[in-house]
Amino acid sequence: LTDRTMAVAEMALWDLAGRMLNIPVWKLLGGYREKVPAYGSTMCGDEMAGGLATPADYGNFAEWMVNRGYKAIKLHTWMPPVSWAPSVKMDIKACAAVREAVGADFPLMLDANHWYSRVDALELGKGIQDLGYYWYEEPMDEHSTESYRWLAENLDIPIIGPEYAYGKFHTRAEWIAS
C-alpha cells in the first residue's frame, strides 16, 4: 500500500467514526485552539559572512529571534557542504553561544541533521544536555530504532527520531511501538 492509499483510508475512517458518533472530526481530533505555540528556527550554518558561520553568529541570531517574541528556538547546526562539518565541538560551541545569549531558562532544541555516528551523537547529546536543551532531534544517519533506543538510554534528554523513515507505514509502526 502506498502512503497516499493509507491517507485516504485513514481519512475515511475518521469520517466514519465522526458520523457514527455524530461528532465532527475536528472534535474527535481534540477541538481547536485559539493560540498555537511556535518556536523560532535557525537555518543550517554556513561559511558566509553575515550568515551563521560562527558560534557567535548563532548567539546573535538567537538574540534577534528573542527580540521578535519567540519563546523557544530550534537550532540546525552546520552540515556538508560546509568544509569542516560535521563537528561535535563546533556544534557544542554554537549551542553554548545560544544558551549564553538567551539565558538559562529559555527553551532550546537542537536538530543535528542526521550527520553523526552513535559515539559522536552521544558526545553531542551530553554536551547539549549539560546546557539544558529541551530535546535533541535526528542526531544520527540511522533508521534503526535500536540505535535511537541506545542513545535515549544513555542520555537524559528527549530524543526525536529521523524525519525520513524508509519503509513507509511498516517502519513508522516500528517507531511508534518503540
PLM region spans:
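Catalytic beta/alpha-barrel core
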Residues: K74-H76, M109, N113, G132-H143, ...
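Catalytic alpha/beta core domains of metabolic enzymes, predominantly
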Residues: H143-Y148, A152-S178
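Structural recognition of alpha->loop->beta junctions
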Residues: L124-Y136, A177-S178
